[in-house]
Amino acid sequence: MKIDVKKMKLDLLLGALGALLMVVGDLSLSIIHSDNSDRGLYVREAYMNGSYQLWRPVLLFATGLIGMFFYSFGIKAMIDQIDPKCRKLRAIMKYGGLAYICTGAALHFFIGTLSYWMTVFSAEFGRETAIRLVDDYYSRFMPAASIAYPFIALLLLGSFISIVSNRTILPRKMLLFNILSWQLILVLVPDIHQMISTNITTMDYVMSQSSGNQAAVIMFVSQFIWLTRNEKKFEQ
């Protein structure tokens, strides 16, 4: 299978940059003081006591828009790694990736607005009213925002299956660095910690809220390194 190694390496680097920018946005939500009363995405003490800075969701919005643009290059690299003979698989990845790029930034921003409204409403109307208003906002808009999740699933499963079935340029050992593998790890670790301990830590939020984007950074960077080490094989 012939590939343009230099172009794919560039696409992987740009994809890693995009995912890293998305992580920055995730961290703007999760790197705050944790409290035992925290629950879910937005009922957090730091939002309600006024210590959360409102420039953070703005940063999330900006890095999300730019990040999804660069992320698209990483998705292109994922598609280009698949054998051209596997047209259906490539089509699934292509259209799933296109839909994710279109919806991912909106979902990212929506999650960010939860912190903004909880902070503003708590200051204006008090905690109980703020929780009630944001609960209503979340229940109304989350079903629509969830449109992004099936496309994310297509990308994750498509990438994993393509390597398992040996339909890409990547060896099966690269499953160790696949986005699905690492996302599961980053989600399960805080879940296991919360089963063992009742205390929710900031690190639990960091790992769970940015799991998908951290996993993407790991995957894109590891594939770049693997491609660099095996570059001569594709030049022959």
Predicted regions and their residues:
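Hydrophobic, aromatic-enriched alpha-helical segments typical of multi-pass transmembrane helices
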Residues: 1-236
